[in-house]
């Protein structure tokens, strides 16, 4: 009977049985369940993730004797294993030993939020494990909130959003990689012993060279419409790292979160460090089933107007590149309208005063209309679009500048630059990245968008571009002890602008 129970729950999903004396935390959607085990003053354990459990299933899992893993592994007292969280306390101690101090579930209209609070057994160091279960789309978001009340800063060396054990078998991994003009190439491979790492160090973008999303096919080579699948997508636009450790145990160990490389974070007393959400889904309808769950989740909860059809558009870039002029824009709008299109987007090349934007070497940062190219301005083009029965969109790249620009001449200190080093330049040999960790830069970027939308409220679409990575590690705004915060501060600033 015991072997039959083990087989049953292996088929259902991923699980770790524990003693029935433990208290269970069951987090469910319409068709999936995540099961954890906890006790006051004990360690939080992971039991299961997969197809939705009945009460009888839960009882069978917790009553079956087997090994288990921490739901959020921490470093220091189990050093050979990978960890989700690694810190250095103010006194130099690099160990953690977390115990459960509380569990709270808040029921919302279409999602339930479960927060499990942990505290170190000795230090006033706290972690909240948060799970938001969207009932109607079968997605669970997982993230952490880290804080402390020690007298001095605590160093966060590693700070994953979540950890998920996946039981070994014939497990295959599907992921996406690529390059410019060669994006989203699918690679599928069996998980073998060792460490598989997918990460991004671009600094600005959640790179097209590798994606922060994977799918685990639990029944062998991936199939589109059949087989058990676990999908994971990290909701973060910056540097990320996905790790899959296949060790000598019975499980593949999956960790996902911000890429901690060169990003040690000095956490102040009372400050809360929130990690990005890891979205998890399960389906027994193959890769397509997992994809459909993610699509429903994104359209319903993450995308503006996610339930609306996207407009058919014409973009000016491939047609004229930087050679924008009023007559050309009018002709392109007439052309897309005559073909039944719904939107025209004027791309790069419409701005610049002292330095008109005629090539990629000048003008980024100077977001005023080039009146020589567009005598009637943006407003005149919007009027033409209305007469043609289409909407109007515009291109910007407000987080960037060129060294040949009025903005750079006024604010060279706004640029991400290593002290005592010459600038490493990007596109056109003059492009630089603005330091979005600086509140003044955040205000500038916000105002670029705000002024466009205030002056031209009928703009229907903004193409926000990003054509450069962070090539120089250094911030004029951050203090000398906070230089390792650069990547995190940049994306916090971007998120602040977009709120």
Question: Can you describe what each PLM-predicted range is?
Answer:
Residues 69-99, 216-243, 282-303, 341-348, ...:
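Glycine-rich, aromatic-flanked loop segments that form ligand/cofactor-binding clefts
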Residues 316-409, 443-447, 488-498:
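Aromatic- and glycine-enriched glycan-recognition loops and surfaces
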Residues 1-22:
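Bacterial Sec-dependent N-terminal signal peptides
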Residues 31, 144, 270, 314, ...:
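Conserved, mostly hydrophobic/aromatic
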Residues 27-38, 44-51, 66-68, 77, ...:
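N-terminal structural segment of carbohydrate-active enzymes
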Residues 31, 87-88, 95-100, 265-284:
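Short Pro-Gly-centered flexible turn/kink motifs
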Residues 22-35, 42-245, 261:
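Polysaccharide-binding surfaces and accessory modules of carbohydrate-active proteins
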Residues 370-377, 383-387, 409-499:
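Active-site neighborhood of glycoside hydrolase catalytic domains
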């Amino acid at each position: 009977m015991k072997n039959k129970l083990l087989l049953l729950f292996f088929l259902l999903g991923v699980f770790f049985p524990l003693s029935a004396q433990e208290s269970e935390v069951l987090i469910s959607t319409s068709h999936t369940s995540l099961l954890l085990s906890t006790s006051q003053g004990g360690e939080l354990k992971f039991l299961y993730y997969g197809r939705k459990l009945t009460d009888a299933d839960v009882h069978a899992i917790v009553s079956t004797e087997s090994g288990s893993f921490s739901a959020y592994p921490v470093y220091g007292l189990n050093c050979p294993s990978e960890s989700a969280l690694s810190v250095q306390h103010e006194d130099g101690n690099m160990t953690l030993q977390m115990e459960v101090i509380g569990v709270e579930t808040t029921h919302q209209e279409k999602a339930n939020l479960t927060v499990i609070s942990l505290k170190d057994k000795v230090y006033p160091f706290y972690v909240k494990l948060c799970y938001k279960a969207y009932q109607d789309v079968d997605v669970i978001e997982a993230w952490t909130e880290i804080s402390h009340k020690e007298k001095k800063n605590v160093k966060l060396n590693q700070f994953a959003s979540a950890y998920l054990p996946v039981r070994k078998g014939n497990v295959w991994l599907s992921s996406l990689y690529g390059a410019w003009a060669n994006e989203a190439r699918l690679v599928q491979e069996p998980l073998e012993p060792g460490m598989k790492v997918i990460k991004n160090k671009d600094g600005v973008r959640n790179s097209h060279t590798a994606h922060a999303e994977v799918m685990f096919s639990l029944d062998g080579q991936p199939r589109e419409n059949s087989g058990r699948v676990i999908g994971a997508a990290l909701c973060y636009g910056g540097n990320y790292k996905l790790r899959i450790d296949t060790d000598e145990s019975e499980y593949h160990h999956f960790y996902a979160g911000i890429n901690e490389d060169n990003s040690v974070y000095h956490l102040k007393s009372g400050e809360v460090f929130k990690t990005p959400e890891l979205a998890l889904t399960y389906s027994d309808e193959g890769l397509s089933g997992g994809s459909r769950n993610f699509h429903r989740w994104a359209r319903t909860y993450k995308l503006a107007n996610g339930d609306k059809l996207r407009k058919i558009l014409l973009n000016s870039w491939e047609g004229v590149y930087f050679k924008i002029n009023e007559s050309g824009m009018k002709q392109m709008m007439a052309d897309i309208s005559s073909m039944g299109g719904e939107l025209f987007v004027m791309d790069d090349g419409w701005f610049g005063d002292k330095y008109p934007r005629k090539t990629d070497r000048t003008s980024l940062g100077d977001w005023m209309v080039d009146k020589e190219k567009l005598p009637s301005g943006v407003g005149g083009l919007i009027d033409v679009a209305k007469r043609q029965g289409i909407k109007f969109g515009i291109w910007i790249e407000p987080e960037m500048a060129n060294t040949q620009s009025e903005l750079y001449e006024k604010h060279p200190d706004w640029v991400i630059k290593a002290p005592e080093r010459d600038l490493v330049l990007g596109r056109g040999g003059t492009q630089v990245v603005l330091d979005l960790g600086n509140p003044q830069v955040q205000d500038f970027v916000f105002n670029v968008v705000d002024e466009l939308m205030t002056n031209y409220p009928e703009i229907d679409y903004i193409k926000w571009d990003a054509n450069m990575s962070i090539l120089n590690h250094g911030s004029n705004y951050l203090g000398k002890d906070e230089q390792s915060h650069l990547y995190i501060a940049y994306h916090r600033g971007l998120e602040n602008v977009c709120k």
